[in-house]
Amino acid sequence: MSATNPTRDDFAALLEESFAKTDLAEGYVAKGIVTAIEKDVAIVDVGLKVEGRVPLKEFGAKAKDGTLKVGDEVEVYVERIENALGEAVLSREKARREESWQRLEVKFEAGERVEGIIFNQVKGGFTVDLDGAVAFLPRSQVDIRPIRDVTPLMHNPQPFEILKMDKRRGNIVVSRRTVLEESRAEQRSEIVQNLEEGQVVEGVVKNITDYGAFVDLGGIDGLLHVTDMAWRRVNHPSEILNIGQQVKVQIIRINQETHRISLGMKQLESDPWDGIGAKYPVGKKISGTVTNITDYGAFVELEPGIEGLIHISEMSWTKKNVHPGKILSTSQEVDVVVLEVDPTKRRISLGLKQTLENPWQAFAHSHPAGTEVEGEVKNKTEFGLFIGLDGDVDGMVHLSDLDWNRPGEQVIEEFNKGDVVRAVVLDVDVDKERISLGIKQLGRDAVGEAAASGELRKNAVVSAEVIGVNDGGIEVRLVNHEDVTAFIRRADLSRDRDEQRPERFSVGQTVDARVTNFSKKDRKIQLSIKALEIAEEKEAVAQFGSSDSGASLGDILGAALKNRQNNE
């Protein structure tokens, strides 16, 4: 057979040899012989009854440079054995795709990477040419981080990983991101192996967040947390760092599993907390600058890297429920006193009010117990009155200290907020910041004096003047203590029931009665004429009569009365 001028018999021999082993059917790739080349198509015989026409452009470079010749053996895809024009429908392009599919399936099963070219942008991603087969590249799989402009990546051969293949639907999904992540992981692993905790390295600030900065250590990033940037308070990393800035850092921790690296800058400097207890002893007065104000207090910088907290309770002696921002402001210079130092927890407790005179102590010094004071009623509660006093302090009058004789719940209704009242200082507790006042102490405690004299002890006999008469009994006033009054009930007016008539008593009349009860708590005095008469009767019987004397009760009482008159 001549290579330059093949005969028809030669073509027949080649075809028989080519198709002897082939059982042709639609939808498969078959080998054929180029029998002729016309203007823009190649005539291909695949051993069917009819030949097929294949566009030259589907042969790619061979068609362009003229290397495709009559007699060449080619692979084409048989779409239809014969169409309406009596020709076989063949496709070199689909044959190439079929070849690619078969090759890609092998690599997909083996987990191997494939090479492709991003050539077009579609909804949700891009199309990739995998040497004849078209795959879909989702936008999320282009890179490790989102990329706005993909133009530099297009039309350049790159490695991809096949995520999914569906031949029935003709779908292939690939990822460039997984390839980058694997490469990056390998690179990170190699870099991490060469790093050690405590090692000092240089890097470039790559990104800044609210909680820290990411530093590129040459192929792997480390996190420099805001708390490890300086010993002093750093409110935001941007205060001391800029993107692109070269920094020297120390490796604090390395997680070999996750390849996460924690970095520190302050660790390169000496720890200002070393020896802090000796430098700031408890009780020392120092100056500082307010750096931050919160709901619970204010932070004060004593020196770079050393801050202390003034708790809200240590800000003012008298302003208890005021936000710290109403007392202090950031950047303000303040004098404070060291209250507590905890080097382990790196905490210093400071006091602002301790730099000022304690108003409770000052009040106690100038107002000892028994001192009379004057102030305005600031509040009225269920347990007493709060009185505003000198020095911006308050004192409390308890219900029990409002009046000697009347219930406090009744007396407190006579006072209103804003009233100016006088009171007596009863006690000052500097530690608890409490001042106890009394209003009733401004007057005499007549009942207390009477009780102290012994006249109100149980069974004591007292003389009283009638000052009032009603159906229930009589109201009397003690003769020896005119400010002390009591009430004798009808049933206690006489042992004789017929004599228990209040109307037989008159105002100004003096009567004797026996104390049957006295309550110090509610200050109530119970008197009884009846009890006195019964007691006197028993005493007379015991003194002037006996069981065998034969004397009548009248004789005994008469003798007792006569004896009493003689004694008087």
Curated annotation (Swiss-Prot):
Keywords: Repeat, Ribonucleoprotein, Ribosomal protein, RNA-binding
Keyword Repeat included in the entry's annotation: yes
Cited CDD domains: S1_RPS1_repeat_ec1_hs1, S1_RPS1_repeat_ec2_hs2, S1_RPS1_repeat_ec3, S1_RPS1_repeat_ec6
GO terms under biological process: translation
InterPro entries hit by this protein: NA-bd_OB-fold (IPR012340), Ribos_protein_bS1-like (IPR050437), Ribosomal_bS1 (IPR000110), Ribosomal_protein_S1-like (IPR035104), S1_domain (IPR003029)
Pfam families: S1 (PF00575)
Function description: Binds mRNA; thus facilitating recognition of the initiation point. It is needed to translate mRNA with a short Shine-Dalgarno (SD) purine-rich sequence.
Protein name, per record: Small ribosomal subunit protein bS1
Annotated organism of origin: Rhizobium meliloti (strain 1021) (Ensifer meliloti)
Gene assigned in the entry: rpsA
